[in-house]
């Protein structure tokens, strides 16, 4: 099970997540969001993620929302990102055609309203990973796991990362309910008073990796 810790705002939290075995670390590159970080912090986190001690090969994900391809690629290179996450209403066919195919993309789809779009796109875009999340993301809004499980049983070819309302107490339940999920994504569920809680980060990764 892949584990992504998103919305990181400090180098300390990033180092903790790397040391605890996270597969992906997400930084918010959308202007004006509560977890958006400035370039110096982003570069510090990037350095921490790409250090030699990162034996697991944790990847750094930049989260974007309805930004131009030029802006996305500029920050991709500036922050030495490994993965681009598109969390808005982007035309994934267009973005995939303009972003080098070697760069992995995570695309947010809302459930259930984006399911038909997802099915239409599935065979037409390469190196794109599906993320089921709420509209805004990072809100703690829990998705309907039962409904996703039922839909997924009819479309087992669609593997996905699940986000929305996950925390150390419920992540194992979500994983058990969603056999076609290949990853879990957490942000607010490992925070205390809006700040990443390092003990919660560690516990979440442990629970998701069992």
From Swiss-Prot:
Q: Which residues form the signal peptide?
A: none
List this protein's GO terms for biological process: L-tryptophan biosynthetic process
The pathway to which it is assigned is: Amino-acid biosynthesis; L-tryptophan biosynthesis; L-tryptophan from chorismate: step 3/5
Q: Which domain of life is it from?
A: Eukaryota
Give the EC number(s) under which this enzyme is classified.
5.3.1.24
Keywords of this entry: Amino-acid biosynthesis, Aromatic amino acid biosynthesis, Isomerase, Tryptophan biosynthesis
Give the enzyme class: isomerase
Q: What are this entry's molecular-function GO terms?
A: phosphoribosylanthranilate isomerase activity
Catalytic function, reaction form:
N-(5-phospho-beta-D-ribosyl)anthranilate = 1-(2-carboxyphenylamino)-1-deoxy-D-ribulose 5-phosphate
Q: Which HAMAP family match?
A: PRAI (MF_00135)
Query: Which PANTHER family does this one have?
Result: N-(5'-PHOSPHORIBOSYL)ANTHRANILATE ISOMERASE (PTHR42894:SF1)
UniProt lists the family membership as follows: Belongs to the TrpF family.
Q: What is this protein called?
A: N-(5'-phosphoribosyl)anthranilate isomerase
Q: Which organism is it from?
A: Kluyveromyces lactis (strain ATCC 8585 / CBS 2359 / DSM 70799 / NBRC 1267 / NRRL Y-1140 / WM37) (Yeast)
């Amino acid at each position: 099970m892949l584990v992504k810790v998103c919305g990181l705002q400090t180098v300390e939290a990033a180092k903790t997540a790397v040391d605890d075995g996270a597969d992906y670390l997400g930084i918010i590159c959308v202007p004006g969001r509560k977890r958006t970080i400035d370039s110096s912090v982003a570069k510090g986190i990037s350095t921490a993620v790409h250090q030699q001690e990162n034996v697991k090969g944790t990847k750094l994900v930049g989260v974007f929302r309805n930004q131009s391809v030029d802006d996305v690629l500029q920050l991709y290179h500036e922050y030495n990102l490994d993965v681009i996450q598109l969390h808005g209403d982007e035309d994934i066919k267009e973005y995939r055609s303009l972003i080098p195919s070697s760069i992995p993309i995570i695309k947010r789809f809302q459930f259930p309203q984006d399911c038909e779009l997802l099915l239409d796109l599935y065979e037409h875009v390469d190196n794109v990973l599906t993320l089921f999340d709420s509209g805004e993301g990072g809100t703690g809004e829990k998705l309907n796991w039962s409904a996703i499980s039922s839909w997924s049983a009819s479309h087992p070819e669609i593997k996905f990362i699940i986000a929305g309302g996950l925390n150390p107490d419920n992540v194992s339940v979500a994983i058990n309910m969603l056999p076609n999920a290949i990853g879990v994504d957490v942000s607010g569920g490992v925070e205390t008073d809006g700040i990443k809680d390092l003990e919660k980060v560690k516990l979440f990764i442990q629970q998701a990796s069992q």
